[in-house]
C-alpha cells in the first residue's frame, strides 16, 4: 500500500471566535506554505464550516471544526466532523454527543499550566480517560510557549518564540498512551 506524508496545521482560530484572521487569510497562508491541510477550531461554534470552509480550498484540505470546553472553561476538546455543537455540559456529555454525530474528539492542551499574564490562564484537562476520546493533543505550541510567561520576559518570547518551546509534555503523552487513538500536535494560533 503506498503511503504519503501530509503536512498541515491543526488547532487554529479565526475571527469567528478569538482569532484575528479570516478563514480566507488562513487558507491563503496555508497554501503559500505548501500545507496539505488546515484544522480550524473556533471556540464553541461551527461558523467556518457553515460559511463553506470545510473541504478543499486553494489546494488545502480544510477541517472546519470547533473547540469545546466544560462549564469551568477547562477540559477543552478539538472537534472535527460533527454537524452540531453540544451544549456546554460536562466533558463526558460533550464527548458522547460528538461520537453520536460521527465526529472526532481530541483532548486539547491537557497539561497546560498557563502564564502569569492576564487572560493567559491554564485550560488543562482534568477529567482523565473518558469514553469518546479519539486522540490527544500531546503538544500544543501556544501552551508550551506561554508556560511561565511574565511581563518581564514577554518581549524575549515574542522576539524568539521557538526558544521557549520544548515539545510534547510527558503528561500529555501519558494520557495519550492511556486513551489510545491519535496523537497530534497543534499550534493553537490566534493570529497571523
Language model segments and positions:
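A metal-dependent hydrolase metal-coordination microenvironment
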Residues: 1-132, 137-191
Amino acid at each position: 500500500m503506498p503511503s504519503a506524508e501530509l503536512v498541515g496545521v491543526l488547532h487554529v482560530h479565526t475571527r469567528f471566535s478569538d482569532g484575528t484572521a479570516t478563514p480566507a487569510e488562513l487558507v491563503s497562508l496555508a497554501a503559500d506554505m505548501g500545507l496539505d491541510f488546515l484544522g480550524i477550531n473556533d471556540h464553541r461554534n461551527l461558523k467556518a464550516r457553515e460559511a463553506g470552509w470545510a473541504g478543499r480550498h486553494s489546494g488545502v484540505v480544510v477541517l472546519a471544526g470547533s473547540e469545546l470546553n466544560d462549564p469551568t472553561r477547562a477540559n477543552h476538546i478539538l472537534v472535527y466532523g460533527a454537524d452540531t455543537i453540544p451544549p456546554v455540559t460536562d466533558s463526558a456529555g460533550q464527548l458522547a454527543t460528538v461520537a453520536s454525530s460521527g465526529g472526532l474528539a481530541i483532548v486539547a492542551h491537557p497539561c497546560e499550566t498557563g502564564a502569569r499574564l492576564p487572560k493567559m490562564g491554564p485550560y488543562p484537562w482534568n477529567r482523565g480517560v473518558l469514553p469518546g476520546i479519539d486522540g490527544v493533543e500531546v503538544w500544543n505550541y501556544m501552551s508550551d510557549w506561554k508556560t511561565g510567561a511574565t511581563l518581564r520576559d514577554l518581549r524575549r518570547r515574542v522576539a524568539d518564540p521557538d526558544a521557549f518551546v520544548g515539545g510534547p509534555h510527558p503528561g500529555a503523552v501519558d494520557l495519550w498512551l492511556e486513551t489510545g487513538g491519535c496523537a497530534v500536535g497543534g499550534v493553537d494560533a490566534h493570529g497571523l
